[in-house]
From Swiss-Prot:
Belongs to the glycosyl hydrolase 9 (cellulase E) family. Residues 1-19 form the signal peptide. This is Xyloglucan-specific endo-beta-1,4-glucanase BoGH9A. It comes from the Bacteria. Pathway: Glucan metabolism; xyloglucan degradation. The keyword Lipoprotein applies. Optimum pH is 6.0-7.0. The lineage of its organism: Bacteria, Pseudomonadati, Bacteroidota, Bacteroidia, Bacteroidales. Gut bacteria supply the human body with energy from dietary polysaccharides through glycosidases that are absent in the human genome. Xyloglucans are a ubiquitous family of highly branched plant cell wall polysaccharides present in the vegetables we consume. Enzymes involved in xyloglucan degradation mediate the conversion of otherwise indigestible plant polysaccharides to short-chain fatty acids. Pfam families: CelD_N, Glyco_hydro_9. Keywords: Carbohydrate metabolism, Cell outer membrane, Glycosidase, Hydrolase, Lipoprotein, Membrane, Palmitate, Polysaccharide degradation, Signal.
């Protein structure tokens, strides 16, 4: 990365009108890339200009018209793959809440400085799960123009031949209602559901005060339970129906044989099935049910008996997984043996040590049983990796590193070893971030861009850095977590705020059947799209092959413009954490 440094000059001007240096090169307004939602007063404030010919910039108060700041460019950096040179501007010295205008080289853009600036994002990201609910009408009083009729009651689901057992032979009718649509499609998947809830509930435990005050206008908002847990409960109820009551195994997914077209849920016609039980489904189920048993114990008034039921289900699922440690879900093999063939999302995984570690850890903290502690230590990771549905080691680590958790001496030593690996990861991630084209840990390697990268790499990297901050109190980790958030909100190569319904330039045509079929021009808000993907597996027309610009805002681009619950779980996790840390102390 070629870096040309300039001496930074910052000054607050008191009543003086200082003229801007004549433009070196006139640029369009959209060449200025910044966080389109705004900044907290004491947050680092960075903008990037899509030009290498910038020297001076000015900040004006948009209300009074007064010039409040003038600065020199911080540095220029050249992209490793697109050959573009960009300039970084730092205006962190501006801290007074208000609306401002940044002017540079003939271009200008407005931005906000305000308290709780990420609250609308955190709320919208969590509210997206309400829009994904199945089997119930999405009502106008909660959804506004995006209200719709109920679809997929799932009270007439068939046991697929791959899932048949003596007590439930193929063709048996079961009821498996509620739950969330997984992504742009209309199916429901245990692996992704378990991971998504596990990540969000891990964050919930860090900021109890924050989540107790959050209201997102869902049907349960007036009960005694925080809205986040209410929303999780809607999917947890469905997950419980996916457990075979006889042996404790968990069906991998509830699905149609093929993806439905872009039609309203109420117009879908395909028969739905539960398919093969899998070890990863059982363990993700066990982990999240054990975790939920602790969290919902305080809310018996709203959800009587759930905590006990969840823990019993968790232990039963874990026992099944121990008996079937190699029961991996392989859709190709399944289709060679059974009909109808299944062609929907696979969520295949041929390694279950991470799921065993996470499930055993959660069960240990929920039951105190030594056997689960021993299993967790036996399956513990040697290095830290950011969380993802295909690698849940981090969720187990988060359980061990929960602030305020009382651990005995041996457990503390084990937790400290996990903390060491987390910090090694965090230090590597932030190395050199302040010299990159977009002044962020994410986005500086072509390998950062792939299917779902904005959540699975950018957001989950940010979540990991936030945990590193909580473990150490070192601001450098938190600053870099904010930088990754700035990236998805506009400080990036395309200039998109990658969350629907937010910012000044956001996706209008996500690969999302609910949005595409509702006859409403604007997409349902609050969804993080997958992001730039040079793999371009969908065959859509992309304007460039450059890794960080390989994005197209079209409905057919499932490789770059789809939405998914696990991606939004990552958005909920980081947006809520950063907002909570700016407002509330950790409880």
């Amino acid at each position: 990365m070629k870096i040309v440094r300039y001496i930074a000059l910052f000054g607050i001007l008191s009543g003086l009108a200082v003229a801007c240096t004549p433009s070196t090169s006139v640029i369009p307004n959209d060449a200025i890339r910044l966080n389109q939602l705004g900044y907290y007063p004491n947050q680092e404030k960075i903008a990037v200009v899509d030009s290498g010919k910038v020297e001076e910039f000015v900040i004006w108060d948009a209300v009074s018209g007064e010039q409040v700041f003038v600065g020199k460019s911080l540095y220029t950096a050249k992209s490793a793959w697109s050959d573009k040179t960009r300039t970084t501007l730092d205006f962190s010295a501006v801290t007074t809440p208000g609306k401002y205008i940044l002017k540079v080289n003939g271009a200008s853009v407005t931005f906000l400085i305000k308290d709780s600036v990420l609250s609308p994002l955190a709320d919208a990201a969590l509210k997206s799960f309400y829009y994904q609910r199945t089997a119930m009408p999405i009502e106008e009083q909660y959804a506004g123009q995006w209200h719709r009729m109920a679809g997929h009651p799932d009270n007439h689901v068939l046991i697929h031949p791959s899932a048949a057992s003596p007590d439930r032979p193929a063709g048996t009718i079961v009821s498996s209602s509620k739950g969330w649509y997984d992504a742009g499609d209309y199916n429901k998947y245990i692996v992704n559901s378990g991971y998504s809830i596990g990540l969000m509930q891990s964050i919930y435990q860090l900021f109890l005060d924050y989540f107790s005050r959050q209201k997102i206008n869902i049907p349960e908002s007036n009960n005694h339970t925080p809205d986040l847990l209410d929303e999780m409960q809607f999917n947890l109820d469905w997950m419980l129906t996916m457990q075979d009551p006889e042996d404790g195994g968990v069906y991998h997914k509830l699905t149609t044989p093929f993806f439905e077209g872009f039609v309203k849920p109420v117009d879908c016609k395909q028969q739905r099935y539960v398919v093969q039980k899998s070890v990863t489904a059982a363990l993700d189920f066990a982990a999240v049910m054990a975790q939920s048993s602790r969290l919902f114990a305080s809310y018996e008034e709203d959800y009587p008996g759930f905590s006990k039921r969840a823990l019993l289900a968790a232990e039963k699922a874990y026992a099944w997984a121990e008996k079937h440690p190699e029961a991996y879900y392989n859709q190709n093999l399944l289709n060679q043996k059974y009909q109808p063939a299944i062609a929907t999302g696979e969520y295949g995984d041929t390694h279950a040590d991470d799921e065993f570690f996470w499930a055993a850890s959660e069960l240990y903290f929920s039951t105190g049983k030594e056997i689960y502690r021993e299993e967790a230590i036996k399956k513990a990771p040697q290095i830290y990796t950011a969380p993802g549905w295909g690698n849940t080691f981090a969720l187990g680590i988060f359980a061990w590193l929960q602030p305020g958790r009382e651990l005995n001496e041996a457990d503390r030593r084990f937790a400290d070893s996990l903390k060491t690996e987390l910090l090694k990861y965090a230090d590597k991630v932030i190395e050199g971030a302040e010299q990159t084209p977009f002044h962020a840990p994410y986005g500086n390697d072509a390998k950062d861009f792939f299917w779902g990268c904005l959540a699975e790499k950018c957001m989950n990297q940010g979540v990991s850095l936030m945990y590193a901050y909580l473990q150490t109190g070192k601001d450098v980790y938190l600053t870099n977590a904010y930088r990754n958030m700035d990236y998805i909100l506009g400080r990036n190569a395309t200039g998109f705020c990658y969350v629907t319904g937010l910012g000044t330039k956001s996706p209008k045509h996500p690969h999302h059947r609910l949005s595409a079929s509702d006859d409403i021009e604007d997409p349902i808000p609050g969804f993080l799209v997958g992001g730039p993907n040079p793999g371009q597996q969908d065959g859509a027309f992309y304007p460039t092959a450059s890794p960080d610009e390989s994005y197209v805002d079209t409905e057919d681009s499932y490789a770059s413009n789809e939405v998914a619950i696990n991606w939004n779980a990552a958005l909920v996790a980081l947006a809520s954490s950063l907002d909570a840390l700016a407002v509330y102390s950790v409880k």
